[in-house]
Every structure is written in C-alpha cells, then in structure tokens.
Amino acid sequence: RRSSSAASDVYKRQEYNLPVTIGKICSDNNVQNFTYISSLGASSKKTNLYLKNKGMAEEELRKLNFKKFIVIRPSFLIGKRIEERLGEKIGIFAMKCISPILVGDLKKYKSINAEIVAKSMINISNSEIQSGVFEPPQLLQIGRE
C-alpha cells in the first residue's frame, strides 16, 4: 500500500500539481496563451490515476481564463527519445501489432509521432484559434500542414 500511495503522490505532483502551478504563475504574470499537453481519454471522472490527474489539471487550467487555452490530447507518443525504457519499448511493439485493426472510431488510439504533435502545437499556436481540445485525428491533420 505504501508504494501505491507513494506512486499516486508522484503522479499527482507530475501530472496535476506541476502544470497547474505553472499555469497559475503564467496567469498571474499576464501570459495570454497557454497550451497544455494532456492525454487522450483524460477526465477527472476516470479511475485511472494518470488520466484522472490529466483531466483535473485540464479543469483547473481552464479556470485561469487565458485568452487562448489549447489542450493537446495525443495518444501513445512515438519518436526519438533520449532515454529508452522497457515499458515504452513494449508499448511501441504492441501498438505496431494492433495498429492495423484500429479503424473507424478506434483510429484515434493509434500511436502518434511526437514531431507531428509538436508541429500541430506550433500551427495551432500561430493560428486564430482561441481555444479547443485537439485529439489525434486533428493533430495529424494540423501537424502535416
């Protein structure tokens, strides 16, 4: 139990406290635009700790009333990494295996390249869009423009 509680504290600090604190600092210093990288499926109502913390952070950041507030919700990120982790290697392999069957409504769960996500963030930031939540289908389209 202790390790589970410690893990949930770490998750909350990383996925909720840190972005909300940064958001408040930005808001207090009159930063007009804020882009938050969340996760596909994020919701404060989820039981999954990662998705719940991401969803709670989205809600708190939204309350800060930035002129332009963008939420980026990528699926499983792939691409170059400084450090390789076994769990991520397994995830990448698994996504490659199941990707061909992710069609229709499931298509948004396909892995997405981090470079595409970065390009879409830049394109959205430079656009007239004032706010919105962007998931993989939109990110793929905007990131290739």
Model-based region annotation:
Residues 34-40, 72-74:
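SDR active-site strand-loop-helix element
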Residues 1-7, 11:
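Single conserved hydrophobic/aromatic residue that forms the stacking wall/gate
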Residues 19:
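Aromatic/hydrophobic pocket-lining residues that form the small-molecule binding cavity
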Residues 29-33, 65-67:
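A short helix->loop->beta-strand "cap" motif at the edges of active sites that frequently abuts
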Residues 26:
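Hydrophobic pocket-lining residues that define ligand/cofactor binding sites across diverse proteins
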Residues 44-132, 137-143:
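Oxidoreductase cofactor-interface core, primarily capturing Rossmann-like NAD(P)-dependent enzymes
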